[in-house]
Every structure is written in C-alpha cells, then in structure tokens.
Amino acid sequence: KVCIVFEGRDTAGKGGTIAAITGKLNPRQVRVVALPKPDPRERTQWYFQRYIAHLPAAGELVLFDRSWYNRAGVEKVMGFCSPEEYENFLRETPYFERSLGDSGILLLKYWLAVDQAEQEARFAERANDPLKRWKLSPIDLVAREKYRDYGKARDTMFEATHRPGAPWVV
C-alpha cells in the first residue's frame, strides 16, 4: 500500500510528473486522484474524510495530484478556510498521517518547486497555447499575486508536517 502525494505551486509540474510515472506502470494497480473542490456535503464532513476512500488497498499505488494539503496552501492563502480550520489542520495532520503508517500505508510526500519567473513563463505559455489554456482558472490568476504568501504557507506547512515516517521531499 503506497500513497504518494504531489504538492507544489501551480505550474510546478505535478501533472506531468505523475503522467511520467504512471505511463510506465500497470494501470490495474495504480490510481491517480485529483479531487475537485469539495461539494456542499463534503464541506460538512471531517476534513480528511473525502480523501480516505481514495487511499490504497494492498498491492495498490495511489498518486494524489494535490491532496489534503490544499488546506495548508490554497485554502489558507485564498481565505477558503477559517483560521481555526487551518490551525486544526496543522495540528491534526501529523496524527492523521501517523495513522496511515500504522495501518501499513507507505506515505511519500513530494513538493515540486518552481521559482516566480519560471511560474510566470509557464502561466504565459498556458494562456497562449489553446491545448493548455484549460489548465488556467480564475483562482490561478489571483494566486499569481500571492506568490510570497504561498511561500510562507509552504514553510509553515513543512514545519508542522515534516516528521519521521512522513518527511517532505523537495
């Protein structure tokens, strides 16, 4: 049971990295999870609940293209969660991840980094390429102005959730 979390700024290459990995593996034992924003029912649940159904069973590899760490990044920076929800997330995540390990799930967490100049170049490429334009969202355009805020949120997330058994790999 292997669960790999890919996180990083927009345009960091999460989707491309996942495609490169899964292209060489047996699709019967590999799943990619990229959840949309929570629906009204999911917003009433325990925060981690919507992710649990997607965790791997024996013999499976699950790759998350973004994950529960949305709360520490986009939700925090864009104001989609309350300060209390954010603090609860930072406090609860190490316990949640420890329980995954205790149940036999190997959790690997990767942060893909891209600097601001490269991110801007990739945003421009997406905007100008009809085959990539679908990747741009209104949130992406607002988030571009919050590059430093995302960096601070990332650093706080690393400090709260980097631990033996589930370290971040940058």
Task: Locate predicted features.
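Conserved nucleotide-sensing/catalytic segment adjacent to the nucleotide-binding pocket
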Residues: R28-R91
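Conserved catalytic network of the ASCE P-loop NTPase/AAA+ motor domain
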Residues: G23-P27, A53-A57, S99-I105, T161-P164
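Pre-Walker A (Motif I) flank of P-loop NTPase domains
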Residues: K1-I4, G59, A166-P167
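Glycine-rich phosphate-binding P-loop
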Residues: V5-T22
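Conserved nucleotide-binding/hydrolysis micro-motifs of P-loop NTPases
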Residues: T11, P38-R41, S67-N70, A113-E120, ...
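A structural signal for short, well-ordered beta-strand segments and their strand-loop junctions
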Residues: V5, V62-D65, L107-W111, V170
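Glycine-rich ThDP/TPP pyrophosphate-binding loop and its adjacent helix/strand module
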Residues: S99, E145, G151, E159-P167
